Amino acid sequence: MQACAVIAEFNPFHNGHQYLLEQARKVTKADLVIVIMSGNFVQRGEPALINKWERARVAINCGADLVVEIPTEYAIDSAKEFAHAGVEIAQKLGASFLAFGSENPDLDFENESKILDRQFDQRAKKYNQNFAAQLFDDTAIMNSNDILGINYAYWNSKSKRGLQLIPLQREQADHRDTEIKGSIASASAIRRAALEQSEYFNAVPKASLKAIRNAKLTSWEDFWIMLNYRLLTSTPQELRHIKGVTEGFENRILNLVDKSNSFTELMQKLKTKRYTYTRIQRSLTNILLNIQATPFNLTKTRLLATNQLGRIFIREAALGSVVMTKVTKEDFENNYAITKRADDLYQLVSPYQWGKGPIIKKNVKE
């Protein structure tokens, strides 16, 4: 069977996402669509609006055949490393295609990735590795979806087993839009509306609306006490070991945390021209979850949800060594220790029946 992979967050799943899955299947004529999805914390360095299991259930009910998880340490990383993990998983699963939304689908993504790679080397020589890495994550250069597309092309070119990249015209609002003006809206606008209990119903499929209404919605403010405690009991030396905390940023954080009464207030105090909100949020998430800089080492992915076609694909492609259907103690210690830590903290503010196996969709609507 030929599979088309889609790397996503679905935070939350909206009409634009459903269109993407439909087009991915239609354009590639793939036998099944695999979604490679962030877990309970997402790439902007914040908790997902609803838990990963419910988002995976929605994806399966809205066009995906198989949903697997990007481990937390990569899901909350820069666009470059987020893409690295997604492409790596897609290749390990034997996907033939990688489809993604783009504002400029005619862009030569492979050529752009080579240009960006050269610019990275130049910036790294002049400044440092951390500052240069922002180039692969810079939405001031172009839209975030195209930045991701370029990073997909970059990592795809590094592999012996390349995927066929399928950029698809994006049918959704700009990710920076904060208002909902119709049936197509940005995920950030929908999150804001859901948290403020204002109207967003026409912008999401029924399955997603049901999930949002029934779930405990989360935001960074739910984790403020945990983060505050972590910072107040940490030394600058300890924070320097945390991924993304460099160039004295640990001192700035510790100087401002006891002057802040909320997560939002701390973010406003920490923001500078050099430190964007997203970069700060990622650093704070790494602090909360005690994520330290380590070499890239992604060997397995966790199965979150599947239908019958997805189960057949896993069996026929002999993916048992790559896809964890049951997570063992050894897996948690070696492959999923950080993800388990993230899930345990998330559960404290958004209770869910953890420990269960993946969601299996039968031939009936769930």
From Swiss-Prot:
GO CC, one annotated term: cytoplasm
Coiled-coil stretches: none
Keywords of this entry: ATP-binding, Cytoplasm, Ligase, Nucleotide-binding, RNA-binding, tRNA processing, tRNA-binding
Protein localization: Cytoplasm
Cross-referenced InterPro entries: Cyt_trans-like (IPR004821), Rossmann-like_a/b/a_fold (IPR014729), tRNA(Met)_cyd_acetate_ligase (IPR008513)
Reactions this protein catalyses: cytidine(34) in elongator tRNA(Met) + acetate + ATP = N(4)-acetylcytidine(34) in elongator tRNA(Met) + AMP + diphosphate
Gene3D superfamilies referenced in this protein's UniProt entry, alphabetically: HUPs
One annotated GO biological process: tRNA modification
Keyword Repeat: no
GO molecular function: ATP binding; ligase activity, forming carbon-nitrogen bonds; tRNA binding
Residues where ATP binds: 7-20, 101, 145, 170
EC nos: 6.3.4.-
Biological role stated in the UniProt entry: Catalyzes the formation of N(4)-acetylcytidine (ac(4)C) at the wobble position of elongator tRNA(Met), using acetate and ATP as substrates. First activates an acetate ion to form acetyladenylate (Ac-AMP) and then transfers the acetyl group to tRNA to form ac(4)C34.
Family: Belongs to the TmcAL family.
Name assigned to this protein: tRNA(Met) cytidine acetate ligase
UniProt organism field: Pediococcus pentosaceus (strain ATCC 25745 / CCUG 21536 / LMG 10740 / 183-1w)
Gene symbol of the encoding locus: tmcAL
